[in-house]
Amino acid sequence: MLLLLPEITLTLIALLGQFFAVMIPNKNRIISNIIILLCILSIFLTFKYSSYEGVWYSFATGINIGISKSIVLLFTIISMIIYRDYSILVADELKFEFITLMLLSVVGIFVAISSRNFLLLFCGMELTALTSYALAGFKLNDMKSSEGALKYFILGSLVSCLSLFGISFIYGFGGSLQFEDILYKLNDNSGMNLGLIIGIILFLSSIFFKLSSVPLHFWVPDVYEGSPITSVTYFNAASKIGMVIVLLNISKLIIGNYYPINYNLIKIIAILSMLFGAFGAIRQTSLKRLMAYSTILNIGYVLIGVLLHNQEGYKAALLYMLIYAVGSIGFFTCLIILLGKDVDKASFKTIQGIAEYHKTIAAVISIVMFSMIGIPPLTGFFGKYYLFYQAINQEEFALAYCGIFTSVVAAFYYLKVVKAMYFSKKIEIIKLPMQYGLLLINYLVVGFLLLGSFIISF
């Protein structure tokens, strides 16, 4: 029962917060501050009561499950602070439903991370998916938001059906839905269980869809463009980190010498994700669509670590995802500070010459872009170096060379952002009142990207 305490606590926090937000409608900001404080305290609860030496999880990744959940919750709290300050910045009403949806989404991620059963894993991912559809369509009067959310919902429903179909295959050919039992079946020397492998592949479609990897990526640019930037920040950080942890958690089931079909399939997915993400972003003018393709590219990098099938590879994948999530939070936060209400229309034109008026913000965006390129001594360089080094060390030369090549290609559009800020024709930007929560997040992002490599080395 204590192992479920983090999930129960977050659910109660979300529901109680929503109750008081409805009963006292004019105090949403005060309620949101209290909820954020309670969530910060919940990090310690999550770490304490999720921290058991689960043989399955520790054997797969060597990372404590309590740490994993705490990381996801921390990034969710940051997303909540960004939404709170964004609503103040644009003088908009803070809708507490947004925070409730984020918290319930995290509960789904927690359930998925803790599960050792395919059906429970599916339920956790579906709770996350349903709340994500609502977050994507939160701009009720915006046609693009509604269109993106509808695409997201329809494709997500289709993938969920495939995932359930896969679970039926797994149960039919494996006789169980427990991870340990299925792993035992896959290790059985009686021959390749093709039906079981097909079931696992079908189930994986749901995870790859939520990770935005090729070929289940077509929804990403439209959803990112139409969704509120606060939703995109959550999708790109807490949600993606959670799904990466889930994928690592079941890595022993999907990759092994006894069924190379899965390995080769994921290898193709990783290479195509890197190529499509790198080249697809080149002609984009919307910064949100640019980050959508950047996400596809970086998920391809993360899959390199998964394919290495050892603890060093898993750690490299999770570390890289954390570094990318921090960078994307910094980028979106800077756009909010610069553009306010117009942030969802952010493009290269809207940031032209901003270095003249906002030197600090331009410097932060530049550091984020250089880190995403992988320029030393920024943390992004060490994340990529560690990942590619492990790939070369395991003689995965195709993955490493593809990663290096696409990093060079991606440098073009990352540097294009820097060029627009410093070398393009200047446009005057209205200075908005500073929100100290957003400013603090930016300072923390810069500190991590500049000094994170020293922290990581220890």
Curated annotation (Swiss-Prot):
Topology versus the membrane: Multi-pass membrane protein
Annotated family: Belongs to the complex I subunit 2 family.
Membrane-spanning segments: 2-22, 30-50, 62-82, 94-114, 118-138, 153-173, 194-214, 235-255, 261-281, 290-310, 318-338, 361-381, 397-417, 438-458
Record-level GO BP terms: ATP synthesis coupled electron transport
Subcellular location: Cell inner membrane
GO terms for MF: NADH dehydrogenase (ubiquinone) activity; NADH:ubiquinone reductase (non-electrogenic) activity; quinone binding
Name of the protein this chain belongs to: NADH-quinone oxidoreductase subunit N
Matching Pfam families: Proton_antipo_M
GO cellular component, one term: plasma membrane
EC number: 7.1.1.-
Physiological role: NDH-1 shuttles electrons from NADH, via FMN and iron-sulfur (Fe-S) centers, to quinones in the respiratory chain. The immediate electron acceptor for the enzyme in this species is believed to be ubiquinone. Couples the redox reaction to proton translocation (for every two electrons transferred, four hydrogen ions are translocated across the cytoplasmic membrane), and thus conserves the redox energy in a proton gradient.
The organism of origin for this protein: Rickettsia conorii (strain ATCC VR-613 / Malish 7)
Keywords linked to the UniProt accession: Cell inner membrane, Cell membrane, Membrane, NAD, Quinone, Translocase, Transmembrane, Transmembrane helix, Transport, Ubiquinone
